[in-house]
Design a protein with these regions (language model features):
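Conserved catalytic network of the ASCE P-loop NTPase/AAA+ motor domain
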Residues: 66-68, 89, 232-236, 241, ...
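Conserved Switch II/interswitch segment of TRAFAC-class P-loop GTPases
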Residues: 13, 49, 79, 268-289, ...
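Switch II of P-loop NTPase G domains
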Residues: 20-24, 47-63, 227, 246-269, ...
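N-terminal accessory targeting/assembly segments
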Residues: 1-103
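Switch I (effector-binding) loop of TRAFAC-class P-loop GTPase G-domains
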Residues: 186-189, 210-240, 249, 254-262, ...
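Short alpha-helix plus adjacent loop in nuclease-associated cores
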Residues: 101-120
Length: 392
């Protein structure tokens, strides 16, 4: 495992709590990529330094730690400009990555099909292009590892023109595969399409396995699923298609949204979304916002959806001391029952609280899914009403 340190900032727009949450996520991403986090460095500032992102004092502090602890990699929570990345790596004399680079690296690890690998390679090349000039030339002795997978290692010193040509070739290859996949989606017939969406590592693949009774790769790591899986599901003789899609994440690189167009087409072309949320995460509401932001970017926000709050078995409200006259009770103290009477109540019967691991309330989820798919089916094929009885 590579010795790694993380760097984040606290600003007026991003307070201490939010910064900590982002760094917790970056920590998990680093572990997923194969790194060992030795320490976190955080600096409060009004805005990032245009040359080195953080201030000179913090730069010196980090450099001393790097020298004393044999650090291989420094990862910044925010995307660095090519200039910032170049300047910082020269000062630290080690690999310097940002969140985008790290996510791209994990995707390179997770890609299993030729199509997924092509998508990741395109995203990496697009990220690499403006950073070619002098990028890590002083690190030739340290090839490989986090941030150096895919085209990262083999094309560090490649001419911009060659990378541009490669981007064009990859786009053509993806366009060709997209056409094939579009035809394949068309060949699925008139079955209703349901797409499972949600933040990364919320249990989407586990739910897919429960509903389809088939094995889809599921693991307690970020981006365990990269390739879209589609299964035909039958509930009470009502057939429909269910697809498990790549997880969303805050600060999702735009290169990935563009490169994974066809994967996200499963969401765009879905008739119904199953939005899975990890309710045990302290910032699950912000995760919902991140997913909805991405759905909005791909013009899928207004689709019919069922909100599935997973991992109720892990949910633990923060203890509230009634005798404490200063402390105020807030959302962190809510029980599941109290959450049900917040904004979630407006979702009516389109919200379910489950535990995919313990199979709690899975039958209720199936009934809800049946009813929603049935509504869409009857609207589309009114003469089939008698085939699928309504569940009371």
């Amino acid at each position: 495992m590579e010795n790694t340190i993380l760097v984040g900032i606290v600003t007026q727009a991003q307070g201490i709590e939010k910064s900590k949450d982002y760094l917790d996520e970056l920590d998990f991403l680093t572990i997923t990529a194969g790194g060992k986090v030795l320490k976190r460095f955080v600096q409060r500032m009004n805005m990032p330094n245009p040359k080195t992102f953080i201030g000179s004092g913090k730069i010196l502090e980090i450099k001393e730690f790097i020298l004393a602890n044999d650090v291989n990699t420094v990862i910044f929570d925010d995307e660095l400009s090519p200039t910032q990345e170049r300047n910082i790596s020269k000062i630290f004399n080690c690999k310097v990555l940002d969140r985008t680079n790290l996510i791209l690296d994990i995707f390179a690890q997770r890609a299993t099909t030729s199509y997924a690998k092509t998508q990741v390679e395109l995203a990496q090349c697009q990220y690499l292009l403006p950073r070619l000039k002098g990028m890590w030339t002083h690190l030739e002795r340290q090839k490989g590892g986090i941030g150096m997978r895919g085209p990262g290692e083999t094309e560090i010193e490649t001419d911009r023109r060659i990378v541009r040509d490669k981007i064009s070739l990859l786009k053509e290859k993806i366009k060709s595969i997209d056409k094939q996949m579009h035809v394949q989606r068309g060949n699925r017939g008139k079955l209703i399409r349901v797409a499972i969406v949600g933040y990364t590592n919320v249990g989407k693949s586990t739910i897919m396995n429960l509903l389809s009774k088939s094995k889809v790769f599921a693991e307690d790591k970020l981006f365990a699923t990269l390739d879209t899986t589609v299964r035909k599901i039958v509930i009470r003789n009502l057939p429909f298609l269910l697809s498990d899609t790549v997880g969303f994440i805050r600060k999702l690189p735009t290169q990935l949204i563009e490169s994974f167009k066809s994967t996200l087409d499963e969401v765009r072309e879905a008739d119904l979304l199953l939005h899975v949320v990890d309710i045990s995460h302290s910032n699950f509401e912000e995760h919902i916002g991140a997913v909805e932001k991405t759905l909005d970017e791909i013009k899928s926000l207004g689709k019919p959806s069922i909100m599935v709050f997973n991992k109720i078995d892990n949910y633990e409200p923060v203890n509230y001391d009634k005798d404490d006259l200063i402390a105020e009770r807030d959302k962190s103290n809510f029980s599941i029952e109290e959450w049900e009477h917040t904004w979630m109540n407006k979702l009516g019967d389109k919200v379910k609280f489950i535990s995919a691991i313990n199979k709690t309330n899975i039958e209720e989820l199936k009934e809800c899914l049946y009813n929603e798919v049935r509504k869409i089916h009857i609207t589309r094929f009114p003469y089939n009403d008698f085939l699928y009885p309504e569940i009371n």
